[in-house]
Amino acid sequence: MSTIRALFASLLVASPLYAQAPNAPFTTPIAADENVITVNYSEWAVLPDVGGAPARAMHAVSPDAVGRVFVLDMGGRIYSVSRDGTNVELYLDLLDPRWAVSVEAGGRERGVQSFAIHPQFGIPGAPGFGKLYTWGDSNNTTPEADFPSGGEAVTHHTVLLEWTARSPASLAYDGGPPRELARFAQPFGNHNGGQLAFNPFVTDADPDYGMLYIGIGDGGSGGDPMRLAQNLTIGFGKIFRIDPLGTDGPNGKYGIPADNPFVGDADALPEIWAYGVRNPQRFAWDAETGAMYVSDIGQNIVEEISIATNGANLGWNDWEGSFRFISREAVDLANPRSDPSVTYPVAEYAQADPLFEGRDCCAASGAAVYRGTLIPQLTDKVLWGDNPNGEIFWFDANNLPEGGPESVHRVLLNHNGEARTLLEVIQDKNREQGREPAERVDMRMGIGPRGEVLLLNKQDGVIRMLVP
């Protein structure tokens, strides 16, 4: 038995703290009061309401060359925010009829999922000058999809678009209609697109420079009923990596990086960089190690964060976290982490953890790797958290755990001299706004203009920055 498997086996029998069950596989819960880090925060920026409701903030990107931060509202608007957060301007409205873009934003999970700014966005004469990319849901299913649903049913499409600004320094988008790069036919209404991102820590001499990573959910429903995440001929349940400026992809609208793991494999899509994910909402790179952390939302049992590498299989739907997936109600407690071909989580927790009792739960979100020094208690920490209830967690980036909740520690916010959860902070803000206190957070993380960690949510329109 490997060291990791032996450790898990000992944990399953040794701890009296927490009863183990097929729907609660860990014997040790998250320690609610141990190794807690409390940090200060500021209300860095406020997005305008949309139709009388708070903006559904999804993602924030800080290009080096333009001196501001771009923030996405899931309803289809991208805002330009000054570095100090005081000036918020509408940069691009995808709903503007000039663009003829269909946005399906009904329900909690549909809308514009993410966006990315090309690393050459602010470099005149460069191929990526002025280019940004959006990844969103559309109710226009008439065009033929580049990536079929894997079955007969199609609920909507998720579409990757390229926009080209004439002047990246402008406070409002001044380019023309977008160019469509790829279209996915979604078999179900949930688990749509995840994050779009370029690796921000590579230089133009690195083969990863300018390569666009695309998080794609498993198609939805529950339990991945068509086993799309493990099917290398289907686009769902994957992380793609493409060259958005290339033309050698199957539809001629993007390129295939030569170092992608399945290039030349007739039984796999060449766009695939990693697979076996359920709903990869967010990922982030470590500036020091280059590791790419992916937070992947579990079914009904385990939430996880993993390090994804070239060609990695993150396990779904054969595995949910460190355990064999049986059904939406159970995992197999025997032989955890026993398949050497699978990349298992570095940290995970159970949806049934006592920490979440009485609260909306659960869906892994984040992440951010803090290598700064302005907030010493966060230095060298990987931050992630839970989307619905807004719990923020940390583990040590220099001493990575090997699964389980033992290294999942809490981050609380200093709110008027008291250590509070993000949900509690938002509820106080809701009362101040004259709104009913929110029951959930819908948390995401972003990066500020100087590498600060931003906390986004869908409940009060406030973007918070962690500060010294």
Label each PLM-derived region with a short phrase:
Residues 221-234:
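Acidic/polar, solvent-exposed loop segments in beta-strand-rich repeat domains
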Residues 312, 323, 328-331, 342, ...:
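Long, low-charge, small-residue-enriched segments that form tightly packed helices used
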Residues 266-306:
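Repeat-solenoid scaffold signature
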Residues 20-223, 282-285, 290-298, 360-399, ...:
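Acidic, Gly/Ser/Thr-rich repeat motifs that build Ca2+-stabilized beta-propeller blades
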Residues 27-52, 85-106, 162-187, 208, ...:
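Blade-edge beta-strand/turn elements of extracellular beta-propeller
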Residues 246-248, 308-340:
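Mobile, glycine-enriched helix-loop/loop "lid" segments at the mouths of ligand-binding/catalytic clefts
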Residues 6-16:
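Bacterial N-terminal signal peptides
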Residues 1-3:
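N-terminal secretory signal peptides that target proteins for export/translocation
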